[in-house]
């Protein structure tokens, strides 16, 4: 099967937004116009095409990024739908990693919202070019130019309108295209639009003013254009388009479009802008990887002739075909039935079938080419972030980084039958989502699940029930505390057991010191003269690493410390790896009295958006939760309070905020850093954990 669309006619895009900015509806409409859907599904009725998991349809939010293929004007557009809720930012990161460009959807009434900022930051980190679609222009209070100004004020983005709405709220009836200098009117809510017309007289001045500031903004990024502009020469439409494209691809400029996806206005123009301004796989820098043997950096060009390389960016369990692995092909081609190398795990994998996904239906294809996004059936060992490549020409592409979970919940199966099923279900869910972890507490035997927030874990439990038919009782959420040392000391660990016959002997001297925040555990071997033989060093390091997991104060993992092994002794007959492993863990226990261990708790960066009149109550509430208010600003007619609050104090905050603001307040939070727990509180936690 030959390539259907050339590389320069391929677009891999994501649609990113705040909750409720209308992202799923926008995606829906795109699929509708590109001929993939026959009846439009409304998110309000819970029947949207992209939101195909049952919980998404019930909650009306998008959780998993389904990858869909569509066609528009002879181009292939692969769309990755990304979730807008902060508990799912890993999904967003994971999809941004494999896209080439994105459409950021804003709500015309609120402009840039807290989650938009988070997602925007992530897109900037990955250098993703963006166009912006100001949606919901038909909504009461919609204000296009205000929304454009929020992009500049809150995100410091060089964003300029390339369209202007004709009318607003229920009078929104058309769109002026500032690039082509024409107007389109919509004749009904089904998106039937007039041919290009002249700009209405009452909009001429505004349109000209905005067009001039657009030309000025892109001319600043292009010297040739700047000269023409300064000399007062006419800048042609193709020149203007080329300059907007160049600025957008360099992530220096963001064109802003307008419309109402719900009322089918402006979506076709968004599709045109995707083709005009967002990159093809050949426009973005070729992906870099490293050779597994030599760690040498190599570049994989985005062509069909290059060796095959791809990144698995999502693993899902499908009710019909089992495990589905979504992957993005960066170079080369892959035929179904062939073998590939998973270079991240050094395993050989067979690709059974290759499917091209439409939100919830699929089409089997025989070959995928560079730049394509597809799903493979039959990969056994591949998980999110792994590289798949040619067996003869291996490479490891840079993987994705996932944040550590911050919240733990104990979970118990309701019956014996559920017990066995629960293990399988949790393993499959953890395979799909790298920010979800599951472990068994060795002392209590309880199963603990950890995730990014309460909603994240709610949905996991919900999926166990629905997809795996596992009934479980869920405990109260627990905070993932950590421990660390505040001072250093030299400590001895000695393990001797002589009881006739062969004994055990391990003896070490280790210097412990606090490490920088976030630097993790560092082990240094400073033994000279072989006082501890070389073969026992790994056992000493392993002994320390195992003991770190259970901490020294209250059983929480010990982080950010340095350990330097500088002395010790051994016995010719009695020493073995096990003895040194135990000696190392004894040294760590002995460090408790000398190294001033403290308890750390996750601090959340919280942003609360509330109407002015509730300001006093909310500030008081944050302070009562041991929070520090770090700033506030007016945003439209609302107030935004930014604060740092310990996660342990944020449980149930959603409910309390609702009751404090009559349901008008919203908040977002994400983990920022770890901070020492105040002494009185840490004593309580230690007591509770030691069961006193």
Swiss-Prot record:
Gene Ontology CC: one annotated term: cytoplasm
GO MF, one example: GTPase activity
PROSITE patterns according to UniProt: G_TR_1, G_TR_2
Subcellular location per the Swiss-Prot or TrEMBL entry: Cytoplasm
This protein's UniProt keywords: Cytoplasm, Elongation factor, GTP-binding, Nucleotide-binding, Protein biosynthesis
CDD domains linked: EF-G, EFG_III, EFG_mtEFG1_IV, EFG_mtEFG_C, EFG_mtEFG_II
Family per record: Belongs to the TRAFAC class translation factor GTPase superfamily. Classic translation factor GTPase family. EF-G/EF-2 subfamily.
Record function comment: Catalyzes the GTP-dependent ribosomal translocation step during translation elongation. During this step, the ribosome changes from the pre-translocational (PRE) to the post-translocational (POST) state as the newly formed A-site-bound peptidyl-tRNA and P-site-bound deacylated tRNA move to the P and E sites, respectively. Catalyzes the coordinated movement of the two tRNA molecules, the mRNA and conformational changes in the ribosome.
Protein name: Elongation factor G
Lineage: Bacteria, Bacillati, Bacillota, Bacilli, Bacillales
Gene: fusA
């Amino acid at each position: 099967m030959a390539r259907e669309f050339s590389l320069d006619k391929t677009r891999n895009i994501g649609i990113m937004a705040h909750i409720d900015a209308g992202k799923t509806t926008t995606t829906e409409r795109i699929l509708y116009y590109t001929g993939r859907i026959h009846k439009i599904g409304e998110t309000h009725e819970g029947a949207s095409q992209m939101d195909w998991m049952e919980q998404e349809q019930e909650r009306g939010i998008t959780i998993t990024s389904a990858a869909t293929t569509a066609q528009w004007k002879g181009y292939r557009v692969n769309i990755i739908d990304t979730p807008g809720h902060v508990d799912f930012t890993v999904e967003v990161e994971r999809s941004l990693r494999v896209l080439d460009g994105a459409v950021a959807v804003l709500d015309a009434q609120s402009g840039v919202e807290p989650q938009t900022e988070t997602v925007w930051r992530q897109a900037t980190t990955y250098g993703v070019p963006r166009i912006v679609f100001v949606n919901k222009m038909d909504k009461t209070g919609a204000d296009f130019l205000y929304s454009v100004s929020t992009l500049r004020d809150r995100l410091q983005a060089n964003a300029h309108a390339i369209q202007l709405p004709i009318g607003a709220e229920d009078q929104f009836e058309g769109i002026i295209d500032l690039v082509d200098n024409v107007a389109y009117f919509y004749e009904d809510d089904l998106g039937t639009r007039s041919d290009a017309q002249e700009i209405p007289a009452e909009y001429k001045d505004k349109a000209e003013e905005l067009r001039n500031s657009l030309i000025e903004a892109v001319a600043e990024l292009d010297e040739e254009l700047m000269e023409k502009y300064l000399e007062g020469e006419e800048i042609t439409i193709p020149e203007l388009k080329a300059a907007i494209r160049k600025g957008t691809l360099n992530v220096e400029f963001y064109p802003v479009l307008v419309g109402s996806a719900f009322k089918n206005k402006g979506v076709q123009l968004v599709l045109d802008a995707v083709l005009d301004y967002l990159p093809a796989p050949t426009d973005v820098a070729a992906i870099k990887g490293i050779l597994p043997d030599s760690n040498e950096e190599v570049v994989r060009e985005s062509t069909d002739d290059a060796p095959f390389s791809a990144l698995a960016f999502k693993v899902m369990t499908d009710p019909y075909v089992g495990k589905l692995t979504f992957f993005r092909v960066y170079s080369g081609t892959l035929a179904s039935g062939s073998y590939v190398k998973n270079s991240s795990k050094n395993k050989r994998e067979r690709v059974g079938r290759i499917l091209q996904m439409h939100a919830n239906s699929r089409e089997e294809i025989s070959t995928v080419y560079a730049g394509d996004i597809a799903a493979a059936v039959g990969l056994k060992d591949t998980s999110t972030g792994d590289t798949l490549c040619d067996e003869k020409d291996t490479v490891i592409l840079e993987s994705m980084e996932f944040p550590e979970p911050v919240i733990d919940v104990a979970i118990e199966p309701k019956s014996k039958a559920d017990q066995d099923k629960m293990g399988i279900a949790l393993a499959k869910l953890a395979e799909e989502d790298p920010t979800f972890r599951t472990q068994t507490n060795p002392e209590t035997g309880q199963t603990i699940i950890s995730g990014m927030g309460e909603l994240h874990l709610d949905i996991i439990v919900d999926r166990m029930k629905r997809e795996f038919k596992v009934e479980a009782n869920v405990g109260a959420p627990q905070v993932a505390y950590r421990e660390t040392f505040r001072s250093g000391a030299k400590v001895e660990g000695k393990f001797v057991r002589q009881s006739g016959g062969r004994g055990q002997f391990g003896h070490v001297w280790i210097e412990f010191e606090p490490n920088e925040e976030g630097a993790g555990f560092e082990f240094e071997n400073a033994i000279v003269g072989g006082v501890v033989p070389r073969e026992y060093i790994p056992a000493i390091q392993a002994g320390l690493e195992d003991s770190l997991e259970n901490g020294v104060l209250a059983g929480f993992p010990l982080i950010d410390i340095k350990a330097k092994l500088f002395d010790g002794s051994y016995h010719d007959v009695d020493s073995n790896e096990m003895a040194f492993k135990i000696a190392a863990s004894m040294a760590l226990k002995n460090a408790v009295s000398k190294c001033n261990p403290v308890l750390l708790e996750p601090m959340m960066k919280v942003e609360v958006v509330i109407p002015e009149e509730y300001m006093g109550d909310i500030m008081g509430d944050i302070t009562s939760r041991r929070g520090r208010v770090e700033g506030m600003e007016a945003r439209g007619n609302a107030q935004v309070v930014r604060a740092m609050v310990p996660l342990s104090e944020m449980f149930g905050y959603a409910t309390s905020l609702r009751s404090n603001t009559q349901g008008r307040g919203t908040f977002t939070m994400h983990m920022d850093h770890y901070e020492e727990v105040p002494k009185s509180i840490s004593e309580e936690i230690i007591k509770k954990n030691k069961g006193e």
